[in-house]
Amino acid sequence: MSLFNDKVAKLLAGHEALLMRKNEPVEEGNGVITRYRYPVLTAAHTPVFWRYDLNEETNPFLMERIGMNATLNAGAIKWDGKYLMLVRVEGADRKSFFAVAESPNGIDNFRFWEYPVTLPEDVVPATNVYDMRLTAHEDGWIYGIFCAERHDDNAPIGDLSSATATAGIARTKDLKNWERLPDLKTKSQQRNVVLHPEFVDGKYALYTRPQDGFIDTGSGGGIGWALIDDITHAEVGEEKIIDKRYYHTIKEVKNGEGPHPIKTPQGWLHLAHGVRNCAAGLRYVLYMYMTSLDDPTRLIASPAGYFMAPVGEERIGDVSNVLFSNGWIADDDGKVFIYYASSDTRMHVATSTIERLVDYCLHTPQDGFSSSASVEILKNLIERNLRLMK
């Protein structure tokens, strides 16, 4: 075997060892979720044959030809008994694309499919696409709604940073062949749009996040709700805010729906992200809330504070101090797999159950919106516990 082939064999063996590494739970926790020791996907998990030209004649030094920078913000779905993430893969060139990775158990051994997703273009091509939410809708299609980013051509000459965000829509029956639908038409920019899994009053329902600019929400008040007559020509008319932003909370700057909600006997379980500003920049955390089965716009539970925040190495990455989730899977036995990205760099999994998540939502105190209210809530728990401890 030649030296070149030896190097290729070593690359492939190292990659296979990474993919086969067994993940293990981190036991210490808060009783709500279980974290796992290793990320489930990193840039190093992408196939060797995506990154290297394995032909000695055209790549005699075995150099990496196409660099991969990050794997993040993945949608998720259970498909043919496998746990699938539709991953945002970011190349070294900063362009993102979508690729499917599958696992037999949802915890480890995630492998990318051979090819990334070939996503048809809209009439107006996007420069970048990312953060797809997957919804298996009752109409029989699997929908993917994602952010389609384009340069803001109304920006001053020489401004190469200003951009616009719209919600791109695509659908599939097999996660391989995709039909591109027209982008969502709205009065404002949109970059966190999620399709509700069921019809509501015979219409498609969307969770939205209206915002004035590409980054800043401005007058956008929180997570919105809109009904759509025709998903193939989707347009938001009336839009109402169902989960508001509040001053001095974990969602004072902006918030956005994560994956589509999970239906439970007690209500719809929602996972969302909240953003606040601090000396280190924008801090992204995850939080939960519940809405009514009879009226998905009616809030029935809103626990105070964050559900998950970055810890340990999760704090470090391309965009530090960030957790983001747009994918989870609920198994028939009630186990829930929460897929989340840390610091725009890598993908992790945490597990819980429907029962625990509902208990967390219904029995965690709501935000009192002041220090004195927080103290009173804390005193109430202390008093009850002290009586039990006597």
Swiss-Prot record:
GO terms for molecular function: hexosyltransferase activity. The keyword Zinc-finger does not apply. The keyword Ribonucleoprotein does not apply. Its EC number is 2.4.1.281. SUPFAM superfamilies: Arabinanase/levansucrase/invertase (SSF75005). Optimum pH is 7. It catalyses: 4-O-beta-D-mannopyranosyl-D-glucopyranose + phosphate = alpha-D-mannose 1-phosphate + D-glucose. Keywords: Carbohydrate metabolism, Cell wall biogenesis/degradation, Glycosyltransferase, Transferase. It comes from the Bacteria. Optimum temperature is 50 degrees Celsius. GO terms for biological process: carbohydrate metabolic process; cell wall organization. Converts 4-O-beta-D-mannopyranosyl-D-glucopyranose (Man-Glc) to mannose 1-phosphate (Man1P) and glucose. Involved in a mannan catabolic pathway which feeds into glycolysis. Belongs to the glycosyl hydrolase 130 family. PANTHER family: 1,4-BETA-MANNOSYL-N-ACETYLGLUCOSAMINE PHOSPHORYLASE, GLYCOSIDASE. This is 4-O-beta-D-mannosyl-D-glucose phosphorylase. It comes from Bacteroides fragilis (strain ATCC 25285 / DSM 2151 / CCUG 4856 / JCM 11019 / LMG 10263 / NCTC 9343 / Onslow / VPI 2553 / EN-2).
